[in-house]
């Protein structure tokens, strides 16, 4: 037992993080993009579908939070979202039409992202205030572990080219299998509400507008949110297109790509823990600035590198930088936002990340298509990396005037 909370409920919640990363890595990051491009879809079509599904999630996530609060039960919504994602992923394993596959991918991605919102909101159900951070950390660790194990469990079912479709059905089944403990053992407390007060949902939209206006009174915070949009735009895109770039621009084999992704995941753990240490020692804003410079160097190397052997070094570098970025940038927000508005501005922080996930894939895809039209062939992907470098550079320039968090004074307009 964890206090009055059954240990099986805690383990069930942690297991769900293990489960959902099997989907996100195998479908979103690893197999769907290369497979659908081999089937004849354009980069622009793929980017548009990723952007559209991200936009749907950005629009519905505040409403989903309100609905779950109003109903008083989140687990039923988690089950519905998970089953919808599993069903769409199973469909990907059987579908023949490119456009049907794109639609199923969009549905799976929306259901997956919506499920994450509900899943995160279940953390207070399986934890107490004093152990919440520890249990959340176990979930993150289980997620990294699930990504690596899921990658290699599915690998025997996925061939090359069109045979990559074989990855989707086992991925769906593994997601469902490891999600079952959460479905079975998490018990929500409190009274069930009978209906949703949609006036509260409209209030969320009104509050979002007020939050954006409110952020204007804090110039440093506003600068940081805009900078985050720019660098998150690049990083969210990298997560989605890394396998495509490794295959098409560098010439890596499927086995090599699996190793590259596994290395990046392992080193993301190192980056997360190491980033936390340096944040405490040097300050979050300073660490984030150094990390963004690291991104510029790493992507610059990736843009010009042609050796498959040398490209293996890019995976660990990206992993470390991803872990350190997400560790440091959320701390920057806590230093810049007034304590009484921290939740409000974390919502804006999250929205910036979601919108970056919409814009980034579109910009990437449009750059690839335009460059290919200009006759650059697979070098078009290198040009697209150059655009990501520009986005991170702009984000870095926007961050520089923000004072270090050890001496932050929040100024009002």
Listing of model-derived features with the role each one plays in the protein:
Residues 156-173, 366-392:
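A membrane-interface helix-boundary motif in multi-pass transporters
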Residues 114-127, 324-338:
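Intracellular juxtamembrane helix-capping segments at the cytosolic ends
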Residues 88, 98-115, 310-324:
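Hydrophobic core of transmembrane alpha-helices in multi-pass small-molecule transporters
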Residues 2-54, 220-258:
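Helix-loop boundary and gating motifs at the non-cytosolic
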Residues 174-185, 385-413:
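Multi-pass alpha-helical transporter architecture, strongest
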Residues 76-91, 286-301:
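Structural signature of the two symmetry-related core transmembrane helices
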Residues 1-7, 189-226:
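Juxtamembrane intracellular "pre-TM" segments in multi-pass secondary transporters
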Residues 59-73, 270-284, 368:
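Helix-to-loop junctions at the C-terminal end of transmembrane segments
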């Amino acid at each position: 037992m964890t206090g009055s909370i059954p240990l099986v409920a805690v383990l069930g919640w942690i297991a769900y993080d293990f489960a959902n990363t099997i989907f996100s890595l195998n479908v979103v990051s690893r197999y769907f993009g290369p497979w659908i491009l081999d089937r004849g879809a354009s980069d622009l079509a793929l980017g548009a579908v990723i952007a559209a599904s991200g936009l749907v999630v950005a629009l519905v996530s505040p409403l989903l939070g309100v609905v779950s609060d109003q109903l008083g039960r989140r687990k039923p919504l988690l089950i519905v979202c998970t089953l919808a994602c599993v069903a769409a992923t199973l469909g990907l394993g059987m579908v023949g039409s490119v456009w049907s596959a794109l639609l199923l991918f969009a549905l799976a991605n929306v259901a997956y992202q919506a499920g994450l919102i509900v899943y995160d909101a279940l953390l207070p159900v399986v934890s107490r205030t004093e152990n919440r951070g520890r249990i959340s950390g176990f979930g993150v660790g289980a997620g990294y572990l699930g990504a690596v194990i899921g990658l290699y469990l599915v690998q025997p079912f996925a061939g090359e080219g069109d045979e990559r479709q074989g990855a989707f059905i086992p991925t769906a089944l593994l997601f469902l299998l490891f999600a079952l403990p959460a479905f079975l053992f998490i018990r929500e407390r409190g009274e069930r509400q009978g209906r949703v007060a949609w006036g509260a949902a409209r209030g969320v939209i009104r509050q979002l507008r007020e939050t954006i206006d409110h952020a204007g009174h804090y110039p440093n915070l506003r600068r940081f949110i805009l900078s985050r949009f720019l660098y998150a735009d690049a990083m969210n895109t990298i997560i989605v297109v890394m396998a495509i770039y490794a295959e098409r621009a560098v010439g890596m084999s499927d086995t090599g790509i699996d190793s590259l992704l596994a290395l990046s995941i392992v080193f993301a753990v190192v980056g997360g823990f190491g980033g936390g240490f340096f944040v405490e020692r040097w300050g979050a804003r300073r660490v984030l600035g150094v990390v963004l410079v690291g991104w510029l160097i790493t992507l610059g190397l990736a843009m010009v590198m042609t050796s498959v052997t040398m490209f293996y070094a890019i995976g660990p570098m990206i992993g470390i930088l991803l872990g350190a970025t997400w560790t440091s940038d959320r701390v920057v927000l806590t230093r810049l936002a007034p304590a009484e508005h921290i939740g409000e501005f974390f919502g804006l922080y999250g929205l910036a990340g979601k919108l970056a996930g919409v814009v980034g894939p579109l910009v990437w895809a449009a750059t690839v298509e335009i460059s290919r039209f200009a006759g650059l062939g697979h070098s078009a992907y290198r040009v697209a990396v150059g655009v990501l470098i520009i986005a991170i550079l702009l984000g870095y320039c926007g961050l520089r005037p923000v004072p270090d968090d050890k001496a932050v004074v929040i100024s009002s307009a």
